[in-house]
């Protein structure tokens, strides 16, 4: 469903000043010796590694940009775990994803679009031949799972819209609930189906106004469905409504396939998700916030059997976890989360203490999800990066082994001169118990001369439940290649230290994090490497919030870039996809008690009169996560007062551009704006 007119051009410009650009940053025909926009076009993304049942190979999704057609081409590659030998197996199919091995290892099933552009299940015989389309769902299939004996699939698909005739076709009013203001209809529920692995007619397993979850990027994938070990039951997550703001009302359920009866697994009616039965059928792991409050980090809980709340087995680690992967012996889970200046993997026994795995300089991808798999002999495969290397697939041959790079999809980057990055630490400016040791990542320009003072560009991460890590960063390397220092500070609310650090942002959305960022800048100044007259602040999403907040609380900034900026928390509460779920981040609804003043005081737009920094605003028109109304508010707050500003909007849905051309355009405009205000080394 298209929300906006196709007559809109690729992006439109609202400018408060005449031709203020010195010209477009050129896109080289061939990549240079340092990281540039041409290198962005050469990057390959790898994700979703799945180890074969014999443990000898894995299949992974490989995604490359096609600028001529503005597409992300996703194919499946088979990789030998011993040698790294790689071959593509989907024979030119351009939209393959979600690969899953059959239990016997003779087939790989995956999702791809059919002629009607609906995702269907395709099955590929590993002995040879082309994949065949198994399903003919009238709507896109969201996910699937093999039955343990390989005889069938369970899958989740959105219900088909009811057919209307005559005047009823135009009767399209819908009841508004806790949804996004961009909704043009009430979302239909997603339900479970089963189909034979040989094909044929699918059987509906569930129905009703409730729904299985669907993905709302940026965020984790939908909570996976899973068969129990004996294949008699299905485990899934149930949401009580289809309204996006009600996603927190989630609870794990189990469906008996023989009787059709479904029951809740735990007593939790909110925040419980990602249930995974153990291979031996004796346990179930699921994700749930400690103490049942979504202000806290998520932990892994383990239930004996399929009934009960279980017990928290990861609270001692004190990190934020999104997923549990069972080891083959069912005695432990593998999990991961952000940790200090990197991300970590742990093996957590059902009973006993966790062991952190040795990953060296490799940072696993943990953005809302642990992109990993555990093999039949206990191998662990995951996607990750190193500070000077884009994403590849890495393997731990055993829990005690060191991570080794398995793939070389981005091998060309090995010869590139990149900026060195390092971890910077400082003490937060608050008194105990909030005088944390904090960190951030500093990236130098390539061939930096030690001690030389350079302009400083802040790139502040979003979330805020996320963190900047000493890993490969496209933004940091692109900006550093211009001759500037790049600083990616972590701040209270980040999830790289402990639960107390993460929840310290509650009812302190900007002031506390702002003090943390200022303290980090002061630490860099003391090194004598910062040109203090030339400091810029930038960020996307919550990074855009922090950018907007900081330009209203300090005037030393030379330039600012606010991508998808949260400027008005009232708009976030009333208009965004999460809407009412955001109340816990402040303490209560702005329309109850005396909470309104908290929401207003923590909104950057409240301090518009102090904003004096030349600012670039970037946003998608159909941004459901951070409404574009807030971009307009920031734009007018600056423009109407004579502050130099430009606002570029992309006429697409989503929280940020996902297509190659617009992604590159964001990078390009980022550099161009900074180039107007910062000198080069």
Pin down the residues of each PLM region.
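A flexible loop/linker signature enriched in serine peptidases of the S9 family
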Residues: 62-75, 90-96, 106-122, 130, ...
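Cap/lid segment of the alpha/beta-hydrolase catalytic domain
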Residues: 407-533, 540, 574-581
């Amino acid at each position: 469903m298209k929300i906006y007119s196709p007559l809109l051009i690729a992006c439109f410009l609202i400018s408060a000043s005449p031709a203020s650009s010195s010209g477009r940053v050129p896109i080289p025909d061939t990549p240079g010796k340092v990281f540039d926009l041409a290198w962005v076009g050469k990057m390959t993304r790898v994700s979703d590694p799945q180890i074969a049942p014999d443990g000898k190979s894995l299949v992974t999704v490989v995604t490359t940009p096609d600028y001529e057609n503005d597409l992300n081409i996703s194919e499946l590659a088979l990789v030998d775990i011993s040698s790294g030998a790689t071959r593509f197996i989907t024979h030119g199919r351009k939209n393959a994803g979600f690969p899953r091995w059959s239990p016997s290892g003779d087939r790989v099933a995956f999702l791809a679009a059919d002629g009607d552009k609906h995702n269907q299940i395709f099955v590929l015989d590993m002995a040879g031949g082309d994949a065949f389309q198994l399903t003919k769902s009238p709507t896109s299939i969201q996910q699937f799972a093999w039955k343990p004996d390989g005889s069938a699939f369970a899958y989740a698909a959105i219900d088909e819209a009811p057919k209307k005739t005559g005047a009823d076709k135009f009767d399209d009013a819908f009841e508004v609930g806790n949804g996004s203001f961009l909704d043009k209809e009430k979302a239909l529920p997603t339900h479970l189906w089963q189909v034979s692995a040989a094909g044929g007619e699918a059987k509906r397993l569930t129905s009703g106004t409730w729904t299985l979850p669907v993905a709302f990027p940026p965020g984790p994938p939908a909570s996976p469905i899973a068969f129990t070990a004996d294949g008699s039951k299905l485990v899934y997550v149930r949401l009580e409504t289809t309204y996006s703001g009600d996603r927190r009302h989630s609870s794990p359920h189990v469906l008996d396939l023989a009787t059709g009866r479904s029951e809740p697994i735990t007593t939790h009616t909110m925040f419980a998700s990602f249930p995974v039965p153990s291979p031996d059928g004796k346990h179930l792991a699921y994700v749930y916030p400690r103490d049942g409050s979504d202000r806290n980090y998520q932990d892994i809980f383990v239930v004996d059997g399929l009934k009960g709340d279980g017990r928290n087995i990861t609270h001692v680690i004190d990190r934020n976890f999104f997923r549990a992967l069972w080891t083959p012996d069912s005695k432990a889970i593998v999990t991961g989360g952000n940790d200090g200046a990197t991300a970590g993997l742990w093996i957590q026994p059902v009973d006993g203490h966790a062991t952190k795995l040795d990953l060296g300089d490799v940072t696993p991808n943990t953005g809302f999800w642990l992109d990993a798999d555990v093999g039949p002999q206990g191998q662990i495969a995951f996607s990750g990066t190193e500070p000077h290397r884009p994403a590849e697939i890495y393997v731990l041959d055993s829990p005690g082994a060191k991570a080794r790079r398995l793939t070389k999809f981005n091998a060309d980057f090995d010869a590139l001169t990149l900026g060195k990055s390092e971890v910077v630490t400082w003490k937060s400016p608050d008194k105990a118990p909030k005088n944390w040791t904090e960190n951030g990542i500093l990236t130098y320009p390539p061939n930096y001369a030690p001690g030389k003072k350079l302009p400083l560009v802040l790139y502040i991460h979003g979330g805020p439940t996320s963190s900047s890590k000493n890993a490969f960063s496209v933004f940091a390397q692109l900006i550093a290649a211009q001759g500037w220092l790049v600083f990616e500070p972590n701040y209270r609310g980040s999830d790289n230290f402990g639960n107390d650090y993460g929840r310290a942002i509650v009812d302190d959305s900007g002031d506390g994090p702002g003090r943390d960022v200022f303290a980090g800048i002061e630490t860099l100044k003391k090194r004598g490497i910062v040109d203090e007259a030339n400091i810029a602040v930038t960020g996307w999403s919550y990074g855009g919030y922090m950018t907007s907040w900081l330009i209203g609380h300090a005037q030393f900034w030379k330039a600012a870039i606010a991508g998808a900026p949260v400027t008005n928390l009232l708009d976030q509460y009333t208009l965004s996809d999460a809407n009412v779920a955001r109340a816990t981040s402040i303490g209560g609804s702005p329309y109850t008690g005396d909470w309104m003043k908290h929401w207003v005081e923590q909104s950057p737009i409240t301090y518009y009169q102090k904003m004096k920094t030349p600012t670039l605003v970037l946003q998608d028109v159909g941004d459901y996560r951070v409404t574009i109304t807030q971009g307009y508010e920031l734009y007018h707050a600056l423009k109407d007062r004579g502050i130099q500003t430009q606002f570029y909007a992309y006429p697409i849905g989503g929280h940020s551009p996902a297509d190659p051309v617009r992604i590159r355009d964001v990078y390009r405009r980022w550099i161009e704006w900074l180039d107007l205000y910062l000198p080069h080394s």
